[in-house]
A protein has these predicted regions:
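Long, intrinsically disordered, low-complexity segments
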Residues: 20-21, 52, 76, 106-107, ...
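Flexible, polar/acidic helix-loop-strand segments at domain edges
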Residues: 327-411, 578-582
Length: 582
């Protein structure tokens, strides 16, 4: 879906707030105001386009909004040791402006959504099918905004009625509680589920848009953030059963990380961020909602942060040695490497000769004696996922907002693994949970798990899901940071120790050592070794609310990261103990 550029001023930007009259006035269409805009379906459809465009900005998903969570997880480390470093080290100060960009851009999204939702009214029964789709999409996108704001900043301001801030004073809201924020997220997704069509019923219209399947998937995710496993399981079962349309795993895992109509918005995707294919883009990088351009590239820069320096990338982020070794530790039933490794980490492996595009890095052949690293000063395993490192599209990184690969934010494999997790939480290890996991493993050619190996041990099956199945399936994607928070891994001594081990990496300019295993036990003995989680400060599993934002709003206070306060007393359930799977 191509998202056309609409002027932010026309689409009710933050600086043009005013009260609205619901009556239609005859006015000059070229001189729209907040009093005349939004009184018909056509103008509200333009607002929908604007909202979708906002989720493609720097602070939402085009770069920082995506990669901050990737940094927070234990599958990725900051190989530049400059850009993102305080966020990777989980000790970002509240004066770091980068941390404000997601806050800024998600509230732009919320503003446009609020305007449209308010225009639609509260009584859904009187809405036409077109208006239901408009309101449903905006509820989904507002829910998505608050999902991200709550997961990042813990206590965001909740603004859900456009009329309540039609004056400037109404903008200075107070913090919500964590529970209040998740309540709002759940409410928005739940209502969106009732208004939107399925991907099947929506047909061509549904391509690239939010559907009831997307809303259901995110509703389950939101429920799981507070350990509402029984409720989430019911929703996930409905998705699997086809209530919200047909979804299935793509036969080729790599099809989830390529651009083009043959791969994007496929049968596995519940929701993805739409970007224009390379070669069809404009020339202007549109980083923020205030520098819009009719000739915007409409691409993302996640690839720029992941890309190796030798290939023109910014060389900022690398895959963790733990993730690489996890892939190498289990072969397929035919004795080969897990094919997901090829699409996740850009290493040379003899087995990749003849597989897909072979041993290439941006069409440049790789050899065993000339490995590619992310950063020439600090090394690092290059991240292949959501880049063109393995797609054969071009021979070097095109930096800036030029990557055209749609970011698949929720896939059917996530539904299956979450259903297995919830089933395990509710009923303990069952054959049903194992079967759902095995669907994902079978796509990769791995052997089936056996219930007998987990019988009566929910902690062991959780370990398998959390630290084997999910990292292999979703390694280096957005979401791992959210998982670590909801699982309580920062609040348990053995789990914190575990993520310190997972987060250990080597800083070296010796490219021959890039694939070596590392040991947390040697941190402090070997100056090249470091673990990001050693520098974690209590409360900084969330990101601090920017001090400039606090200065502008006297009603707003900092969160646990601003105050360096522990959240251990705010858990929604016990933390699973570490279980040795070997």
């Amino acid at each position: 879906m191509k998202l056309h550029k609409i002027s932010l001023a026309v689409l009710v930007g933050l600086g043009t707030l005013a009260s609205c009259d619901s009556k239609l006035d005859v006015s000059n269409p070229n001189q729209q105001t907040t009093a005349t805009f939004g009184n018909d379906v056509e103008s509200l459809e333009e607002n929908v386009i604007a909202a979708y465009n906002h989720i493609r900005m720097e602070g939402t998903y085009a770069r920082v909004g995506y990669t901050l969570d990737v940094c927070r997880g234990d599958e990725v480390w900051n190989s530049s040791q400059v850009w993102y470093m305080p966020f990777d080290d989980l000790n970002a100060p509240f004066t770091d402006e980068i941390g404000q960009w997601s806050w800024r851009d998600w509230y732009y999204t919320i503003n446009v959504c609020n305007y449209t939702i308010t225009r639609c009214g509260e009584d859904n029964s009187v809405l036409s099918e077109t208006m239901k789709r408009i309101k449903g999409q905006m509820l989904f996108l507002r829910g998505l905004a608050y999902y991200n704001l709550t997961g990042y900043y813990q206590n965001p301001i909740l603004i859900s009625d456009y009329n309540t801030y039609s004056t400037l004073d109404g903008l200075y809201g107070t913090n919500s509680t964590y529970d209040e924020a998740w309540d709002q997220v759940e409410k928005d997704f739940a209502e969106a589920m009732t208004l939107l069509p399925s991907r099947d019923a929506g047909g061509q219209w549904a391509l690239g848009r939010a559907t009831n399947g997307a809303a259901a998937g995110y509703y389950a995710r939101a429920l799981m953030m507070r350990h509402k496993y029984s409720e989430a399981l019911a929703v996930l079962k409905d998705i699997i059963g086809g209530k919200y349309g047909h979804y299935e795993l793509m036969k080729n895992y790599g099809d989830n990380f390529r651009e083009g109509s043959a791969y994007e918005n496929n049968a596995e995707s519940l929701f993805e961020i739409q970007y224009l294919d390379y070669g069809s883009q404009g020339t202007d990088d549109e980083w923020t909602p205030v520098n819009t351009s009719p000739n915007a590239t409409q691409g993302h820069a996640v690839e720029s942060n992941f890309g190796p320096g030798d290939m023109g990338g910014w060389a900022d982020l690398s895959a963790s040695p733990w993730l690489y070794q996890l892939f190498k530790s289990e072969k397929t039933t035919s004795g080969s490497l897990d094919p997901r490794l090829y699409w996740t980490i850009g290493t040379y492996e003899p087995e990749w000769d003849g597989f897909e595009y072979g041993n290439v890095c941006y069409t440049v052949p790789m050899t065993a004696d000339a490995p590619v690293v992310t950063n020439n000063n600090n090394g690092g395993l290059p991240i292949a996922k959501n880049t063109n490192l393995r797609t054969g599209l071009y021979d070097k990184v095109v930096t800036g907002l030029h990557c055209g690969i749609n970011l698949r934010m929720m896939r059917y494999s996530d539904v299956l693994l979450r259903a297995a997790e919830c089933e395990n939480e509710v009923n303990g290890p069952t054959q049903q949970a194992i079967d759902w996991i095995n669907q994902v493993r079978n796509r990769a050619g791995l052997a089936d798990l056996k219930l007998a190996d987990f019988s009566g041990n929910a902690d062991k099956l959780f370990e398998q899901i959390a630290n084997v199945e999910r990292p292999k399936e979703f390694g280096c994607e957005f979401g791992r940071g959210f998982d670590l928070v909801r699982w309580g891994f920062f609040y348990s001594a053995d789990r914190l120790q575990q993520i310190k081990e997972h987060g250990t990496f080597r800083r070296t300019n010796d490219k021959t050592r890039v694939k070596e295993p590392v040991s947390y036990a040697e941190v402090g003995l070997d100056p090249e070794l470091k673990s990001s989680y050693d520098s974690w400060i209590q409360g900084h599993e969330f990101f601090p609310i920017y001090q400039g934002t606090l200065n502008d709003n006297p009603n707003l206070v900092g969160n646990s990261a601003n105050k360096s306060e522990s959240n251990a007393d705010k858990l929604y359930g016990p933390v699973h103990p570490v279980v040795n799977l070997k």
